[in-house]
Amino acid sequence: MGQQFTNAEGEQTEIDVAELQEWYKKFVVECPSGTLFMHEFKRFFGVQDNHEAAEYIENMFRAFDKNGDNTIDFLEYVAALNLVLRGKLEHKLRWTFKVYDKDGNGCIDKPELLEIVESIYKLKKVCRSEVEERTPLLTPEEVVDRIFQLVDENGDGQLSLDEFIDGARKDKWVMKMLQMDVNPGGWISEQRRKSALF
């Protein structure tokens, strides 16, 4: 029998008790104080010295910090893991929208999207294979222009939540570009491998 848990969208989901206990054990090991602070979150992702990566991780942290107290407690941790591991596409896109909307006005403008795309490009550069290295990429500005061209239905220069979700559902390229990697395992592994070499 599982525990009822309300996810970010207010829906009841069931989490297995054994799984919840395992998550708690991991949380206590990583955060003996019972709360996860920004500096610990950054350390986990190995981004203390990388400004662009730090901004990306700070945005993720703020999105997981539901009550805005600048810490992630166990319930917020469980909600984050539930989103990452089990979340429906729409929930992940809603969360991604919240991360991208840095000023919290309910819309994403070009400068906000450009900042995120540039950060993601810098983060992902580390993980590109040799074949990918030879494949020319669009510049971050070209990515943002193309996304707005495909997704900004009313042409107001801002993406609403509905435009963001609809655009991602209609176009696979847009989906790939808009859907934030909330489980950047390859990037984390690469960062840890690099730090082990020094």
Swiss-Prot record:
| Known function | Stimulates synthesis of cGMP in photoreceptors. Thought to mediate Ca(2+)-sensitive regulation of retinal guanylyl cyclase (GC), a key event in recovery of the dark state of rod photoreceptors following light exposure.
The record's subunit annotation is: Undergoes dimerization at low calcium ions concentration, while the presence of calcium ions inhibits its dimerization. Dimerization correlates with its ability to activate GC.
Q: Which GO terms describe its biological process?
A: regulation of signal transduction; visual perception
Cite the positions of N-myristoyl glycine lipidation.
Answer: 2
Which Gene Ontology CC terms are recorded?
A: cone photoreceptor outer segment; photoreceptor inner segment
Which residues are Ca(2+) 1-binding?
65, 67, 69, 71, 76
Q: Specify which residues bind Ca(2+) 3 according to the UniProt entry for this protein.
A: 152, 154, 156, 158, 163
Molecular function terms, GO-annotated: calcium ion binding; calcium sensitive guanylate cyclase activator activity
What name goes with this protein?
Guanylyl cyclase-activating protein 2
Source species, please?
Answer: Gallus gallus (Chicken)
Report the record's disulfide bonds. Answer: none
The record's tissue-specificity note reads: Retina and pineal gland.
